């Protein structure tokens, strides 16, 4: 970037840009934000705006692009959405009063994790994550700058850190330590995160907890430092940090949540077709955010679950009151977002009017709950603080039709401030006086077309055409000459104009000052507003669960202290809703206390996966406080759910289906307890038949002997059904089929015992494979069944015979075996093991 012979303004730009090399610098110049040099070239392409140049006639013209300040937010949103940072440099003084170059400073750096304003605000959280490390310990802190929520936890390995970041759907991570090359590869390339570094700490005794572990303390304080460094203002809406443990909630990793379609459909990436879509009858943005949080983190505390259930039951029992409650919630705006705008100093009159409207709805909501006369609701009612003094202040001060821009005037109600009313009176009377002067001078001069006009240059003036110049009174003085007319003034008109201009300026200044005082006063209520937002959100979520329970015919589940599962005529609620008018076939799931594993067999497409997901979905719904789809349901409280359902290859990181299967299986058997739920669907299909079967059997045996977790294990290895005779806690179940006159019907019904056929050719027929291909497959199948062999017969005689080593013969020792024998696998990370395997595979 050349800096020779730059103008003072461009030198100022260059100096500021040096401080923010990783951000687009939006440099305020009048009514535009300008970008220069590489920023201009890149922004023009990304934002699809014109690229021009400054000093076009110079040897090296400076590339330039700009966006209007009043519509800048939509352009900022595009840059942030694509993972860039944006630094905003504002004019810090009035250009008209500046001596030399206008003073400019960066007032905010907007990053993917610190977005507060947006041209498209939504109800999703935007979490900014910070991680720090001390030895093998990790501290992970995160916050949402809109809601002010602030959390921290401690984790024991980098895999758990990545899992938590995925669960939070964070886009930016603040790093308090230097990443290894491997860690950077995972975070930046595989997880596509924006990485920011922060070495300094921000010590805030109000927000931080001195009882935190050191690494948790540093992760929290560095996150605070980064937020203050980028936002450059007081953040009074941030809540004190809350420490949590992942084990305090029903644990599910990112893959499990994705396979169960908890908050979005895994195939479409959209809300529709997810549990969130099913349960969301919320009426407020806060309620929607809280519901999503409850789905992500179901409870393991029976007392808290039952507390939620009881409120849902109250709402079910009071239909008309619930209907009134729903209507009242529709008048509630996003209090958390409004509170953050107050804290950021960005509140406009519209925000305050929305806040007043919300506060005026609270007494009605509270009265509805009190009218139900249920002790269960007492804790909710206590959170509904209407803050009447704040609602009264805003309603008395802000005009109902106030403009959004605080400098446009007309913000403050008439009658709120006596001095402001006087200025407005002068303006109104001045307008009347001008009309009177116009009429008087028209009559006295005899100029019938005489009129008073106004523009910024000449102020108020009499407009006289050339044909009437001979009738101009002597006390008129010329202000401007035009081609066909002239403009005149009088001392009287000038005096009134002066009074009006003075009143207009004083009125505007006073109105702005009053609004600033009101905004400052509102800022004193931020904590109470946040508490109110939490209360309304909780009410909203619980009424939503009641509505869904009623419309989807859900029942209240019971929790036992044993490990028994007894779900009578259970349904997969999301699948049922998607099916619409079609008939959903319910299934009973029963696992006695001494049964830990159900081995599920049956044809593809028969409903094995849905049956397994049904159990997991029911458990999640039950533990977040929702009612569940069944005739009756008795469940244990699970501490974790592990799944391997689906076969999506992880192509980005180069991991095959089988590798993903093995990693997820390892995650389950490493972390599951006897109180966990494990779902494995067709484990082992990503490798050779014998390998897959051997692994599947050994995993089943390991879970049976060492873990004891409730497990549904669906398999196409029918040989595994014989395990029922040797594993006392395993039972076989299968998906029933009806075979009649050569036609096969899948009944989607789970019955005891193993399946006798796989019906793979029938599934292929449904998929539309050619008839001659299916006939050939049927012939091969008959030959295999007659021969009792696992290997298919050759299509034709080959000219050479390839000898295959027996699976059980001892082969010559391969050099790779020697290398494997040297590995100290107990002191290696999973990633190191995988890297070694990749290297060895390349040698084969």
Curated annotation (Swiss-Prot):
Q: What GO CC terms are in its UniProt record?
A: cytosol
Q: Please give the superkingdom of this protein's source.
A: Bacteria
GO terms in the biological process aspect are: mismatch repair
InterPro entries assigned? DNA_mismatch_repair_MutS, DNA_mismatch_repair_MutS-lik_N, DNA_mismatch_repair_MutS/MSH, DNA_mismatch_repair_MutS_C, DNA_mismatch_repair_MutS_clamp, DNA_mismatch_repair_MutS_core, DNA_mismatch_repair_MutS_N, DNA_mismatch_repair_MutS_sf
Query: Which keywords accompany this UniProt record?
Result: ATP-binding, DNA damage, DNA repair, DNA-binding, Nucleotide-binding
Q: Which SMART domains match?
A: MUTSac, MUTSd
Which residues bind ATP per the record? 602-609
| Family named by the database record | Belongs to the DNA mismatch repair MutS family.
What function does the entry list? This protein is involved in the repair of mismatches in DNA. It is possible that it carries out the mismatch recognition step.
Identify this protein by name.
Answer: DNA mismatch repair protein HexA
Q: Tell me the organism.
A: Streptococcus pneumoniae serotype 4 (strain ATCC BAA-334 / TIGR4)
Give the organism's phylogenetic lineage.
Answer: Bacteria, Bacillati, Bacillota, Bacilli, Lactobacillales
């Amino acid at each position: 970037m050349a800096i020779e012979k730059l103008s003072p303004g461009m030198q100022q730009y260059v100096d500021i840009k040096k401080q923010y090399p990783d951000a687009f610098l939006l440099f305020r110049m009048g009514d535009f934000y300008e970008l220069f040099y590489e920023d201009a070239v890149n922004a023009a392409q990304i934002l699809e705006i014109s690229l021009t140049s400054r000093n076009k006639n110079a040897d090296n013209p400076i590339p330039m692009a700009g966006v209007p300040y009043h519509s800048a937010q939509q352009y900022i949103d595009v840059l942030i959405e694509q993972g860039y940072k944006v630094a905003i440099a504002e004019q810090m003084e009035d250009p008209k009063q500046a001596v030399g170059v206008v003073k400019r400073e960066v007032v905010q750096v907007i990053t993917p994790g610190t977005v507060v304003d947006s041209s498209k605000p939504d109800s999703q959280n935007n979490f900014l994550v910070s991680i720090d490390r001390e030895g093998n310990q990790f501290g992970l802190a995160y916050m949402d700058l809109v809601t002010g929520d602030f959390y921290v936890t401690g984790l024991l390995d980098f895999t758990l850190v990545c899992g938590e970041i995925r669960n939070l759907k964070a886009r930016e991570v603040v790093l308090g330590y230097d990443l290894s090359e491997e860690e950077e590869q995972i975070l930046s390339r595989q997880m596509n995160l924006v990485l920011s570094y922060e070495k300094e700490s921000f010590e805030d005794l109000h927000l931080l907890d001195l009882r935190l572990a050191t690494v948790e303390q540093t992760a929290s304080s560095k996150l605070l430092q980064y937020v203050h460094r980028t936002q450059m203002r007081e953040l009074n809406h941030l809540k004190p940090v809350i420490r949590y443990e992942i084990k305090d909630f029903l644990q599910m990793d990112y893959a499990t949540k994705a396979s169960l379609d908890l908050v979005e459909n895994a195939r479409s990436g959209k809300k529709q077709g997810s549990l969130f879509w099913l349960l969301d009858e919320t009426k407020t943005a806060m309620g929607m955010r809280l519901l999503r949080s409850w789905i992500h983190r179901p409870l393991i505390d029976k007392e808290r679950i039952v507390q939620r259930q009881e409120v849902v039951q109250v709402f079910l029992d009071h239909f008309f009151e619930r209907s009134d409650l729903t209507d009242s919630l529709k008048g509630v705006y996003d209090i958390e977002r409004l509170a953050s705008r107050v804290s950021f100093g960005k509140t406009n009159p519209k925000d305050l009017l929305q806040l007043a409207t919300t506060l005026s709805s609270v007494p009605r909501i509270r009265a509805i709950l009190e009218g139900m006369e249920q002790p269960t609701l007492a804790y909710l009612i206590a959170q509904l603080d209407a803050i009447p003094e704040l609602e009264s202040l805003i309603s008395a001060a802000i005009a109902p039709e106030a403009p959004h821009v605080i400098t446009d005037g007309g913000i403050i109600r008439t009658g709120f401030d006596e001095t402001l009313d006087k200025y407005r009176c002068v303006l109104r009377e001045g307008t009347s006086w001008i009309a009177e002067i116009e009429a008087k001078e028209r009559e006295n001069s005899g100029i019938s077309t005489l009129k008073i006009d106004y523009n910024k240059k000449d102020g108020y003036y009499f407009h006289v055409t050339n044909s009437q110049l001979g009738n101009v009174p002597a006390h008129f003085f010329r202000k401007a000459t035009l081609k066909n007319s002239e403009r005149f003034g009088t001392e009287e008109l000038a005096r009134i104009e002066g009074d009006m201009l003075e009143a207009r300026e004083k009125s505007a200044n006073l109105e702005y000052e009053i609004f600033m005082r009101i905004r400052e006063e509102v800022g004193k209520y931020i904590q109470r507003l946040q508490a109110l937002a939490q209360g309304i959100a909780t009410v909203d979520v619980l009424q939503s669960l009641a509505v869904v329970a009623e419309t989807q015919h859900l029942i209240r589940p019971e929790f036992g202290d044993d490990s028994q599962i007894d779900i009578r005529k259970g349904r997969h609620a999301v699948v049922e809703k998607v099916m619409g008018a079609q008939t959903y076939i319910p299934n009973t799931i029963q696992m006695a206390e001494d049964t830990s594993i159900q081995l599920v067999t049956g044809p593809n497409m028969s409903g094995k996966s849905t049956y397994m997901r049904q159990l997991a979905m029911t458990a999640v719904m039950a533990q977040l406080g929702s009612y569940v789809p069944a005739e009756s349901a008795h469940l244990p409280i699970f501490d974790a759910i592990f799944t391997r359902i689906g076969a999506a290859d992880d192509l980005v990181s180069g991991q095959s289906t089988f590798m993903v299967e093995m990693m997820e299986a390892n995650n389950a058997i490493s972390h599951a307890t006897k109180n966990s739920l494990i779902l494995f669907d067709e484990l082992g299909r990503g490798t050779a038949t014998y390998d897959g079967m051997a692994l599947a059997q050994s995993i089943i045996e390991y879970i049976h002997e060492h873990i004891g977790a409730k497990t549904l294990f669906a398999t196409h290895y029918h040989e595994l059904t014989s395990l029922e005779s040797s594993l006392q806690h395993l039972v076989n179940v299968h998906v029933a089929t009806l075979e009649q006159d050569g036609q096969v019907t899948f009944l989607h019904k789970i019955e005891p015992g193993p399946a006798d056929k796989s019906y793979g050719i029938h599934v292929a027929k449904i998929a539309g494979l050619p008839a001659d291909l299916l006939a050939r497959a049927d012939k091969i199948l008959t030959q295999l069944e007659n021969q009792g062999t696992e290997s298919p017969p050759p299509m034709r005689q080959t000219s050479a015979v390839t000898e295959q080593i027996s699976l059980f013969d001892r082969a010559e020792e391969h050099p790779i075996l020697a290398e494997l024998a040297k590995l100290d696998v107990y002191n290696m990370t999973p990633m190191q093991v995988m890297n070694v395997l990749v290297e060895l595979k390349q040698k084969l």
